Regions:
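Membrane-interface extramembranous regions
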Residues: 1-209
């Protein structure tokens, strides 16, 4: 049994290069798939809440951050009145998203995400391309993770009735579906840092450093 365990460890110890390749393939799949989905209106509609609340990106949308009064009499950002559930269609809300530049922004973001995924993958063959992709990937994941701070919808907000009933799922650390989607970028960030180190070492070796 001991020899079998040692053999397993010997095999596992030699998986580093395979691991690098798998991380590159994983980032390619995730980024190209998600980037491609940015050309679908339902996906574009879903990112508005993140962008509209970001101090770094909200200027890219025309109307999303405007304050309006909801039918309930609450002052909210305009995008809140134009949210469309996945699989649903509302022509008036779709027209608002066109006016808001939602789809234009989403298409540009999709192209950028796809390009980053491809560059990271190509780092398997060219460390300079990989380095560029990994730096961009790290910047993008930091931007995505910032949504946990800027997006109210990333956290559960229990109603007064729920709180009165003893419901404890309210605020930190209780992530909504949107927040759970964002937090996964921590793993992508870690993988990109590992690949950045690999690309940097390969470039230094080529330079004879």
């Amino acid at each position: 049994m001991n020899k079998l365990f040692v053999s397993f460890l010997d095999c596992a110890a030699n998986l580093q290069n395979l691991g690098y390749k798998l991380i590159r393939v994983a980032i390619l799949i995730i980024f190209v798939w998600i980037g491609g989905l940015k050309f679908a209106n339902y996906e574009a509609n879903g990112i508005v809440k993140f962008v509209a609340n970001s101090p770094f990106m909200s200027f890219m949308l025309k109307n999303a951050s405007n304050k309006v009064t909801s039918p309930e009499g609450k002052v909210v950002k305009e995008y809140k009145l134009n949210e469309v559930k996945e699989g649903a269609y509302d022509p008036a809300k779709s027209a608002w998203h066109v006016e808001n530049r939602t789809y234009t922004f989403s298409h540009g973001l999709g192209l950028l995400i796809c390009a980053i995924g491809i560059l990271v993958f190509l780092g398997m063959f060219n460390p300079y391309l990989g380095l560029a992709g990994e730096v961009l990937c790290i910047i993008m994941t930091f931007g995505t993770l910032s949504f946990l701070v800027t997006t109210p919808e990333a956290w559960v907000h229990a109603s007064p009735e729920a709180l009165a009933a003893g419901e404890y799922a309210n605020g930190f650390p209780y992530l909504t579906g949107a927040g759970r989607l964002v937090i996964k970028d921590v793993a992508i960030l870690a993988g990109a840092v590992v690949l950045l180190s690999q690309s940097a070492k390969a470039i230094l070796a080529r330079l004879g450093k």
